[in-house]
From Swiss-Prot:
Nucleotide-binding protein. GO terms for cellular component: cytosol. CDD domains: YajQ_like (cd11740). PANTHER family: UPF0234 PROTEIN YAJQ (PTHR30476:SF0). GO terms for molecular function: nucleotide binding. Belongs to the YajQ family. Keywords: Nucleotide-binding. This is Nucleotide-binding protein Mmc1_1670. NCBIfam families: PRK05412.1 (NF003819). Pfam families: DUF520. It comes from Magnetococcus marinus (strain ATCC BAA-1437 / JCM 17883 / MC-1).
Length: 161
């Protein structure tokens, strides 16, 4: 039976490139002269350190722009709360979302089942597998999910006949 997987993955190398480009732009921008603003990435967490809330907002806007240029959807970024840091600075942790959480997977399965398509959707860890008897049914399911606006971007891979 034909099947495909619904995943939500981001290329961390592209995220790293976007972070490096953001750091480079911050060091050369005139409005950041004398600023101690920094950006660091460890695994799936980007830490933004800035002088004040305004500069923090500027850094996040630059980061989002660089993400878009690197073909990384900004919806992958989960911005945490702004917290005070040492030396009258502010810090914000940005988590890069990887995989589909169980609540979001249930929402995807429910959307497919409510559409009354001739496919079955099953949650498998951090992905959703959709199987059907015909390839056309699977393509209808992909079209349905692309037409929906979810809070997290989806990719469709592992399409098998």
């Amino acid at each position: 039976m034909p099947s495909f997987d619904i995943v939500s993955e981001v290329d961390l190398q592209e995220v790293d490139n976007a972070v490096n480009q953001t750091v480079k732009e911050i060091t050369t921008r005139y409005d950041f002269k004398g600023s101690k603003s920094t950006l660091t990435r460890e695994d799936a967490v980007i830490t933004i350190l800035a002088d004040d809330a305004y500069k923090l907002e500027q850094v996040t806007e630059v980061l989002k722009g660089k993400m878009v240029r690197r073909s990384v959807d900004p919806h992958f970024l989960d911005f945490g709360t702004v917290e005070p840091a040492s030396g009258a600075m502010v810090r914000q942790n940005v988590t890069v979302k990887q995989g589909i959480e169980s609540e979001f997977a249930k929402k995807i399965v429910k959307t497919i089942k409510n559409a009354k398509l001739k496919v079955q959707a099953a949650i498998q860890g951090d992905q959703v597998r959709v199987t059907g008897k015909k390839r056309d049914d699977l393509q209808e399911a992909i079209a349905l999910l692309k037409s929906q606006s979810f809070e997290q971007p989806l990719q469709f891979n592992n399409f098998r006949d």
